[in-house]
Amino acid sequence: MTERRVPFSLLRSPSWEPFRDWYPAHSRLFDQAFGVPRFPDEWSQWFSSAGWPGYVRPLPAATAEGPAAVTLARPAFSRALNRQLSSGVSEIRQTADRWRVSLDVNHFAPEELTVKTKEGVVEITGKHEERQDEHGYISRCFTRKYTLPPGVDPTLVSSSLSPEGTLTVEAPLPKAVTQSAEITIPVTFEARAQIGGPESEQSGAK
């Protein structure tokens, strides 16, 4: 199968979603800014005090040895938290008729992104050279691959980039073959033609 590069369109305004303004974007999509600076210490302190079950918990030293231990453990905890939230988790959704992937690429310009399909796989690549920001010099690059569902036509894959920096790649799913309802066909019997019947008598009279 040949490789196909998928062009993406730039959305001037975010797509309308009901309840979009009721909750922040990070509740739907984890932070995927590759190489971002670590979180401020006050954030890590708040997370460590919250201790969400099943997500992140305060370090043992922070709970057993008092405030002094919290101060010492804070940088290590902040780095661990940053690794969790910058792991690049994407969001995949599949409905009855559509397959969709959303990826946060807000640190990349449109010309630094490439989306292509090859052998039933969507490959998303982002790369920008070293540049300077408020923290120093940094360069970023990533590659993500997603397997298309069976039967999806790779030529129908499309992508778009929202103003918030969310890249959406989607494709229509093939329609399921519906089985027709069972129909009973009646069998009819044809009667044999009678030899010497009325029709034959009329033809003989002529």
Swiss-Prot record:
Residues that span the membrane, as ranges: none
Acetylation recorded as keyword: yes
Post-translational modification: Phosphorylated upon exposure to protein kinase C activators and heat shock. Phosphorylation by MAPKAPK2 and MAPKAPK3 in response to stress dissociates HSPB1 from large small heat-shock protein (sHsps) oligomers and impairs its chaperone activity and ability to protect against oxidative stress effectively. Phosphorylation by MAPKAPK5 in response to PKA stimulation induces F-actin rearrangement.
Main location: cytoplasm
Pfam families in alphabetical order: HSP20
Location of region: Interaction with TGFB1I1: 74-206
Family from the record: Belongs to the small heat shock protein (HSP20) family.
Protein name: Heat shock protein beta-1
Organism per entry: Rattus norvegicus (Rat)
Gene that encodes the chain: Hspb1
